[in-house]
Amino acid sequence: MTNTPKRPPAGLPDKQTLLAFLRDAGSAEKTDIARHFGLKGGDRRALREMIRELEAEGALGKRGRKGFSPSGALPPVGVADVVERDVDGEMYVRLVEASADAPRALLMPDNSGRTGPAPGMGDRLLVKFSRGAEGWEARLVKKLDSERNRVLGVIRKSNREVRVEPVDRRSKDVLLVPHAQAEGLKDGDLVLAAIEKGEQRYGPKRGKILETIGREDDPRAASLIAIHSHGVPTGFSEQVEQEAEDQELPSLKGREDLRDIPLITIDPADARDHDDAVYAQKDEDPKNPGGWIVWVAIADVAAYVRPNTSLDREARDKGNSTYFPDRVEPMLPERLSNGLCSLKEGENRATMAVRMVFDKDGRKIGHKFMRGLMRSHAKLSYEQAQAAIDGAPDETTGPIMEAILYPLWNAYHTMLKGRLKRSPLQIESAERRIRMTPEGGIGSIEKRVSLEAHRLIEEMMIQANVCAAETLEQKKTPLLYRVHDAPSQEKLFNLGDFLGTIGKPWTKGEPATTKRFNKLLDETRETEHAEVVNEVVLRTQMQAIYSAENVGHFGLNLDRYAHFTSPIRRYSDLIVHRGLIRALGLGKDGLTDREIAELPSIAEHVVMTERRSMAAERDAMDRYIAAFLEDRVGATFGGRITGVTRFGLFIRLDETGADGLVPVSSLGSEYFTHDDRSHALVGERSGLRWTLG
């Protein structure tokens, strides 16, 4: 608990008293609540029933494994970041270090008469929170960041002046820079500039050029803009590069020799690094008839990136690799990411491997981790492996059909039985891929096709990740979990309201389960509502995060889960590898006591870096798609509504996946009201409805 409110007289509180206590306390577990109100015996049972009712009503939400707090509650005063600005210019803030489902708040106009620059995107503020008619509102108390001091922009030259115009068109920070600073720069150069501090309050701000990034008309500018706009770390220091160059392949000493096991890699056709390799064989144990042994071998990054080295500090800072259509900003230097750590065909590589045993019903009945030395027997793309299984093997896949590919697929189909019983969430997502030309232009935008080969690798990786979490728990070694909380009651109530508008029953008081969601998706899959229901169910889910505390993984329907299978590109996985090394006594390069103490802060950091990368990747994708459509202005496209707000409709084009806004002012002369319950804009005179989907 964050505070300790004054203790009331003993006795069961009413619902409002309980909610008031939780608002003051921040959050509390059932035992804390019972102790505070002096409850015993039957009163404790009544308290549990009251909490269940408040959850069903959407008034209470879970916090962690056992805690409860009022749904969507914000403190009276807090530190918040400006995280969003809508097309109307209204800005929204979110509480710093808030939970994933914490509400944002509308930043209200400052009528205090204070001087100085107004808050902008990225600023950190001290604000007062309050409930408004349409949600949470925030009022500025104090700016904690004196000003935004950097602008990514384009040089615009004239005889009179040199300007830096921000690439973010919503920004008003046009800078004037001295001609002397702009010598050698050309009109259209992309630059990073600093806002000069001073007392200037009117007219363009003064700026100083920090770095020249590229050209506005370079086809690859979209990625450069995204990298710098979102602060994605680039490159490596000389010390880190040298440390990577000094690494050598470990010897077989202290490792299992796995080189004769015909492990293969199956990856995207353009993959440069190969984290994982797989192999399956029938289990010959007479006690496990119809069972399978599945091997998953992962690059042993921990053998090269040791705790508190320059390599380690750089990898932690980056948190993960970031992927753009034309480039990758890797977490590790190329010597490792595309060299010693990558499981290349025919080359000896250090590995952390897990041998898993499944019974005929797809239930995992045993596993064992080991450090080894392996040699990949084939490098396949997903399309290549799928074509072989579908009856069109090539010169690479033909010779390995009987010994490798058929056993892999047969093992996968057995594992599917266990997956079906588990019933993970089956939400469809329409990912798109940009194919670049050799010159760096955009060749095409394609929808990713989901193949059985993708699902095979996904399921084998999921099971290996489960093994990692189970082993670390069994050995009582702290770890970074990958957690995904169940949807909040508030989101479930909103889902129920929406489903009621399309005639689909949804009992609001029932607990959310993946089976229940999957049943809903199956029932609407062949109907006109399929896409919109899929979209709304997706939005109902919480974001998966990393945590030192386990709350399970709702989407996968797993009690415990960790990321183990991608240590080349995710720091979280490297931490899990080190945990296994420590827990199983597999070397001296395992998780340190200091890292164990820092697990909560590491979790928080890698959640931030993951979201930073996702935002940058989306930004670059949007810019590439916009560039692709530049010469098609005025053309007609098919699309669907993916968002409905009071100020307009968000549309996604079917062909390219481009997202755009149709302002409410362009829908006609009549007044449209926003029906939040049914996700619709409704014309007051005509009754015309623009709805999600």
What is each of the regions a protein language model found here?
Residues 1-295, 302-347, 379, 384-389, ...:
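Charge-lined substrate channels and their catalytic hotspots, especially those that engage the 3′ end
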Residues 192, 198, 215, 225-232, ...:
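Electropositive polyanion-binding surfaces
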Residues 500, 692-693:
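Generic low-polarity alpha-helical segments
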